Amino acid sequence: MSARRNADLDRDPSPSRPTVATRPLRPLRPLAAWLMKRLEGVDDADYRRHKRALFADLSGTIVEIGPGTGANLAYLPRDIALTAIEPSPAMRRYLAERAIELGRPLTLLEGTAERIPFPDASVDAVVCTLVLCSVADPAATLAEIRRILRPGGRFLFIEHVAAPRGSWLRRAQWLARPCYACFLDGCHTDRETWRTIADAGFVQVQLAHFRTHPGVTAPHIVGVTTAG
């Protein structure tokens, strides 16, 4: 392989901000919700053990950001006061149906991750799985999460992330990003989300890397941060 080709692979092809091509097309949001609902079974097999461990000791007032079709509801403790904030009407319909099916109380609000409709220091924990890949501004989202968490409150997350820079998988993620963003509600396949979380100002960050099924979204992180 030539030195020039090596240099091309080492250069991160992903811009720090989404381009026009990677912004979600709102008319396709119902399709994105339908696809995510159909993929729940596949995702559940990959994430089950991580969710059980991550959510086991949750208590108090909990906010889930971007709950989508309700894939986490079966894993969240039943005695928490749960509020779900979801911007997509199609996702909210699936989520409401899932909550009824499971027979669990749920406050469902329309909103975005960058402007969470909660007062400062009012929440015991925030749950966010497979969401930071698709928000318009991950740093602003994490700042909002810090804002609403009480001192000592926790942010719990599972996210698919970028492969190592210079790898063939990273290049494949870059190539796949426009398609994922278009059909999966703005999903970015190549965000270095672990760096954004580390820079978000939490007093403690614990995370681990893991891999799921083969594909461009195989690299993942799971973890917990603590607010000051």
Segments from the language model and where they lie:
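Conserved class I S-adenosyl-L-methionine
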Residues: 2-60, 71-72, 89-94, 173
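C-terminal alpha-helical "lid/dimerization" subdomain adjacent to the S-adenosyl-L-methionine
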Residues: 23, 35-45, 158-219
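Class I SAM-dependent methyltransferase SAM/SAH-binding core
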Residues: 61-63, 67-115
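Short glycine-centered segments of the SAM/dcSAM-binding site in methyltransferase folds
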Residues: 81, 152-154
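A short acidic, Gly/Pro-enriched loop at the edge of an enzyme's catalytic core
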Residues: 114-126
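A short SAM/SAH-binding and catalytic strip from SAM-dependent methyltransferases
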Residues: 124-137
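A short glycine-rich, Lys/Arg-flanked "PGG" loop and its adjoining helix->strand segment in the class I
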Residues: 139-151
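C-terminal lobe and adjacent flexible extensions of AdoMet/dcAdoMet transferase-like proteins
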Residues: 220-228
